[in-house]
Regions:
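C-terminal, flexible cofactor-proximal segment of oxidoreductases
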Residues: 114
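Nucleotide/phosphate-binding catalytic cleft detector across ATP-hydrolyzing
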Residues: 1-17, 21-101, 117-131
Length: 132
């Protein structure tokens, strides 16, 4: 079985999981040598993508206007941040056929509503708790 490294680069922190272990470090303290060696690397990035420069074979996630039953409220996939997109896809996986209201409280506060049929109704982004 392949060793898969999942990385999330946010505005404030870099988080990763590998073989069931979760790690997080502030972006300003992140160095590539903190990451374990992996056969496959997948990353979500709303922060500084160059933090992974020098890491080979990284597959960066992108937003899509449609994915399986998900249908974005935005006409242009790039208008929906990959972090919000992946959160909605994950929530739909864990709570199928249910209306889902998502709140993400990170550097920014985001709110999104996805109906049971997968139709994204839109969302809101505002400054995070540390800024308010």
């Amino acid at each position: 079985m392949d060793n898969i490294l999942l990385i999330d680069i946010g505005n404030t922190a870099v988080k990763w999981t590998f073989n069931g272990e979760y790690h997080s470090v502030l972006t300003v303290n992140f160095k590539l040598d903190l990451l374990p060696k992996a056969d496959q690397v997948f990353a979500s990035c709303v922060g500084d993508q160059s933090l992974l420069s020098g890491l080979n074979n990284v597959v960066f996630a992108t937003s899509f206007d449609q994915f399986q039953s998900f249908k974005s409220a935005y006409d242009t996939p790039q208008d929906l941040g990959v972090d919000r997109f992946l959160t909605m896809i994950g929530a739909m996986h864990h709570y199928p056929d249910q209306n889902i209201f998502l709140i993400d409280a990170g550097s920014a506060l985001t709110f999104d509503l996805v109906l049971a049929n997968g139709k994204h109704q839109g969302g809101l982004i505002m400054p995070g708790l540390g800024v308010l």
